[in-house]
From Swiss-Prot:
Residues 73-106 are annotated as: Domain II. Transmembrane segments: none annotated. The gene is dnaA. This is Chromosomal replication initiator protein DnaA. Oligomerizes as a right-handed, spiral filament on DNA at oriC.
Length: 445
């Protein structure tokens, strides 16, 4: 970067500063860095896509006018997200933790690395297992099956594994694919008579990462093809990593031969983050995105948003945008105003196992203690199974946690209860009515 460009930019932002509130300037303009100036085209580095969008829609003309005032020239402004810039510079031998080896490997998100993953009690085991697999592919745990709710970090860990392996061995053939994309490619290969090419793509590789495997349930041809792909890779001592929103035993209409193979290696779950982890996630996000957020505001967000990381980070960005658009300082009051729709919606649908146990016990004229007891008489065992079924359906609690809430029962007992009620619902109209009634009562709590 030339000294002239640096000096010109510093003068320009001084002009811009006089046109904006301190909040808007610090949030959107301060983080910009000039990259290059060629043929009246100015490239400016920005920290993220969100900032880029705001700058292009609200502040681009302001920047153009400030530069025109200084130089009497009208520049074309091109905002470049810094992460993309780093990837580009990798080809110029700059130090980078991400190695791109071919077209398939570019499916990996450069932001999803082990360094950017925030570790907490809710994901420590899954993180450790993922790192072990990344360090010793096909030697530690094969397959590695990661499951958990939406937005908890499963995809992040899968991409991190891919990046780590490629960093240590750039020649590794790493393929990341969603089960939906796998299915669509299979359909196209059948339609275009390219079965051989399809099989070569997925069987002649070193690492296969398949996201959201639950979506192949009920797709017989996809399951057949994936079964043979799995076998080919496993027998060739290649690493397989799979993610799902539920454990293998709970994926409906999944062939038993696939279910058993998914259970050959290690199964690791990710739970919703606790308060300390939520705070760490927010602080890391603010640091990475160069956002100036008061600590008390992050405490407020972490207290109100508990379900998943995606919503947590989304709340942070929403507050920053709200602050800029209203020209108000970021505070707890502003955060409350910005998130009022999200928080009220969350609060109205928050269901706990305690609520479920209370409603089910009342419905069947039992005590909550009966549902937690060791008694197995039908008048208690059946309502207990219904309560376990509803706990699995309506909460984000893990199977072991649900079992613990019902008198310290094993997670396999919860699975049995869930499967039994699910199967009976298909043919028992009175049970369907009971479940519908219970759902209404739970939602009214």
């Amino acid at each position: 970067m030339s000294t002239h460009l640096t000096e010109t930019w510093e003068k320009a932002i001084n002009i811009i500063k006089g046109e904006l509130t301190e909040v808007s300037f610090n949030t959107w303009i301060k983080s910009i860095n000039p990259i290059s100036l060629e043929n009246n085209s100015l490239k400016l580095a920005v920290p993220n896509d969100f900032t880029k969008g705001i700058l292009e829609s609200r502040y681009k003309d302001l920047i153009v006018n400030a530069l025109k005032l200084l130089t009497s020239k009208k520049y074309n402004i091109d905002f470049i997200v810094t992460t993309e810039e780093k990837i580009e510079k990798n080809h110029n031998n700059e130090k980078s933790n991400i190695v791109v080896n071919d077209e398939m490997s570019t499916m990996l998100n450069p932001k999803y690395t082990f360094d950017s993953f925030v570790i907490g009690n809710s994901n420590r085991f899954a993180h450790a297992a993922s790192l072990a697999v990344a360090e010793s592919p096909a030697k530690a745990y094969n397959p590695l099956f990661i499951y958990g709710g939406v937005g908890l970090g499963k995809t992040h860990l899968m991409h991190a594994i891919g990046h780590y392996i490629l960093h240590n061995n750039p020649k590794s053939q790493v393929v990341y694919v969603s089960s939906e994309k796998f299915t669509n490619e299979l359909i196209n290969s059948i339609k275009d008579d390219k079965n051989v090419e399809f099989r070569n793509k997925y069987r002649n590789i070193d690492i296969l990462l398949v996201d959201d495997i639950q979506f192949i349930a009920g797709k017989e041809r996809t399951q057949e093809e994936f079964f043979h792909t799995f076998n080919a890779l496993y027998e060739a001592n290649k690493q397989i990593i799979i993610s799902s929103d539920r454990p293998p035993k709970e994926i409906p209409t999944l062939e038993d031969r696939l279910r058993s193979r998914f259970e050959w290696g290690l199964i690791a779950d990710i739970q919703a983050p606790d308060f300390e982890t939520r705070m760490a996630i927010l602080k890391k996000k603010a640091d990475v995105e160069k956002l100036n957020i008061p600590n008390e505001v992050m405490v407020y967000i972490a207290t109100k948003i508990k379900s998943n990381i995606r919503e947590l980070e989304g709340a942070l960005i929403r507050i920053v945008a709200f602050s800029s658009l209203t020209n108000k300082e970021i505070s707890v009051d502003l955060a409350s105003e910005a998130l009022k729709d999200i928080i009220s919606s969350k609060q109205t649908r928050q269901v706990t196992i305690d609520i479920i146990q209370e409603v089910v016990a009342n419905y069947y004229n039992l005590k909550i203690e009966d549902l937690k007891s060791a008694r197995r008489t039908r008048n208690i065992a059946f309502p207990r199974q219904i309560a376990m079924y509803l706990s699995r359906k309506l909460t984000d609690m893990s199977l072991p946690k649900i079992g613990e809430e019902f008198g310290g029962r094993d997670h396999t007992t919860v699975i049995h209860a869930y499967e039994k009620i699910s199967n009976n619902l298909k043919k028992d109209e009175s049970l369907q009515n009971a479940i519908n009634d219970l759902n209404k009562r739970i939602n009214q709590k």
